[in-house]
UniProtKB/Swiss-Prot annotation:
Basic and acidic residues bias locations: 28-44
GO-annotated biological processes: carboxylic acid metabolic process
Gene3D superfamilies given in the database record: 3.90.1150.170, Type I PLP-dependent aspartate aminotransferase-like (Major domain) (3.40.640.10)
Name this polypeptide is given: Putative pyridoxal-dependent decarboxylase domain-containing protein 2
Residue numbers spanned by region Disordered: 28-47
Pfam families membership: PDXDC1-like_cen (PF22930), Pyridoxal_deC (PF00282)
GO cellular component: intracellular membrane-bounded organelle
Enzyme class: lyase
Recorded GO MF terms: carboxy-lyase activity; pyridoxal phosphate binding
């Protein structure tokens, strides 16, 4: 009995007090147990299953990842679940883990190591792709490099942009020129990133009379530039293609370079054909890209390397590159080059060149094979060096234009020609699906071109990971 209850003379009252205290304690204990149980149920209900308890072992976690990667085991796989990335791919993947470990170094060692990695990779890429005295910006989003280059061009043309901001552009609006054959959404992306209105974009049409219909019309571009200057606008930057997104054609970069120098316009080049700059033989149109102001490349797909960043090479301007965001002192930004730094050393120059050469040879072999097949039309710009092959089945109509498209003839009504075109497109769509199932590693794609209709594209440089064997 508690000492406080012992002081009560009346034993009956003391007993009642004791019983009351015990009863209250029982009620409190019961309430506490109920609250604890409800709390556990609440936690169990709110916390996802994998996080409950004291954690899981690594084997179980990796098993879960494997199941997620493979999907439902009962499904019949339509294509290989996991791409074989090869040993050089494992080196690139290692770069990401190694980068996380490097970040644990002390500040001075980290600075020296990241600077060395960035400078080495920049030098190697400039030498391989014949780009003299250039700097490199590594980025995950392929279009990000061009957005940074646009900022650099704005700062170089508008000296007071740092102080005045966008109000400094009002009196002389900048103009960015894009080819009609540019990849979809590029113009909108640039305007969103730069905060520019859509009228700052100028779409340059492709040739209609002479040359490739997927190649920028240089004469029309010059007319657009003159018109913009007369209206008080500032021609800022031109994006040229060394391999258009659709058919892999290259603009007349040499002529465009002369035009840009004449009017003080920044020339940026992008496209899959830039990979051929690493080869011994390079077409003159692509070789001219080595003299441009900047160019964006994607060595990851070209070499079959996973998780390797895109690279934009540009002419260095110490006063402006920092403010344009092309240079960063953050170790994490410099370490973006690490996977490529490791992979280039693993492959060596011979291995690097051999992969690009092999992809180009695959295109040449396909071209030679298609020439032997009746009713196959090939849309290739340069049969000797083009790494992209676009083709389609097409049975020419009597009196039709043999240059890859059907045109009305006197004996056929427009509706008959339309039905013929529709049937041909449907057949090419079926042909593409069949070829993709027969040779899934080919990376063959089916696309619709405005003038030609449904076509099949073979671009081994963009599917190099599947072409290793």
């Amino acid at each position: 009995m508690d000492a406080s209850l012992e002081k009560i003379a009346d034993p009956t009252l003391a007993e009642m007090g004791k019983n009351l205290k015990e009863a209250v304690k029982m009620l409190e204990d019961s309430q506490r147990r109920t609250e604890e149980e409800n709390g556990k149920k609440l936690i169990s209900r709110d916390i996802p299953g994998p996080l409950q308890g004291s954690g899981q072992d690594m084997v179980s976690i990796l098993q879960l990842v494997q199941n997620l990667m493979h999907g439902d085991e009962d499904e019949e796989p339509q294509s290989p679940r996991i791409q074989n990335i090869g040993e050089q791919g494992h080196v690139a993947v290692l770069g990401h883990s190694l980068g996380a470990y490097i970040l644990t170094l002390d500040e001075e060692k980290l600075r020296k190591l990241t600077t060395r990695i960035l400078s080495d990779t920049t030098l190697w890429l400039c030498r391989i792709f014949r780009y003299e005295n250039g700097c490199a910006y590594f980025h995950e989003e392929e279009r990000e490099g061009l957005a940074k280059i646009c900022r650099l061009a704005i700062h170089s043309q508008y000296e007071d942009f740092v102080v005045d901001g966008f109000s400094g552009l009002y009196n002389k609006k900048p103009v960015i020129y894009l080819s009609a054959a540019a990849r979809p959404g590029l113009g909108q992306y640039l305007c969103n990133q730069l905060g520019l209105p859509f009228p700052c974009l100028c779409r340059v049409p492709c040739n209609t009379m002479f040359g490739s219909q997927h190649q920028m019309d240089v004469a029309f571009l010059e007319k657009l530039i003159k018109d913009d200057i007369e209206r008080g606008r500032l021609p800022l930057l031109l994006v040229a293609n060394a391999g258009t997104a659709a058919v892999g054609h290259t603009d007349k970069i040499g002529r465009l370079k002369e035009l840009c120098e004449q009017y003080g316009i920044w020339l940026h080049v992008e496209g899959v054909n830039l990979a051929t700059l690493a080869l011994g033989y390079v077409s003159s149109s692509v070789l001219a890209a080595a003299k441009c102001d900047s160019m964006t490349m994607t060595p990851g797909p070209w070499l079959g390397l996973p998780a390797v960043p895109a690279v934009t090479l540009y002419k260095h301007d110490p006063a402006l590159t920092l403010v344009a965001g092309l240079i960063s002192n953050k170790p994490t930004d410099k370490l973006r080059a690490l996977p490529l730094w490791l992979s280039l050393q693993y492959l060596g120059l011979d291995g690097f060149v051999e992969r690009i050469k092999h992809a180009c040879q695959l295109s040449q072999w396909l071209q030679e094979s298609l020439k032997k097949v009746n009713y196959i039309k090939i849309l290739v710009e340069d049969e000797l060096s083009s790494p992209v092959v676009v083709f389609r089945f097409f049975q020419e109509l009597p009196g039709s234009d043999p240059v890859f498209k059907a045109v009305p003839v006197p004996n056929m009504t427009p509706s008959a020609v339309g039905r013929e075109r529709h049937s041909c497109d449907a057949l090419n769509l079926w042909l593409g699906e069949q070829l993709k199932q027969l040779v899934p590693a080919s990376g063959l794609t089916v696309m619709d071109l405005e003038a030609e209709g449904t076509c099949l594209r073979f671009s081994p440089l963009m599917t190099a990971a599947g072409m290793i064997s």
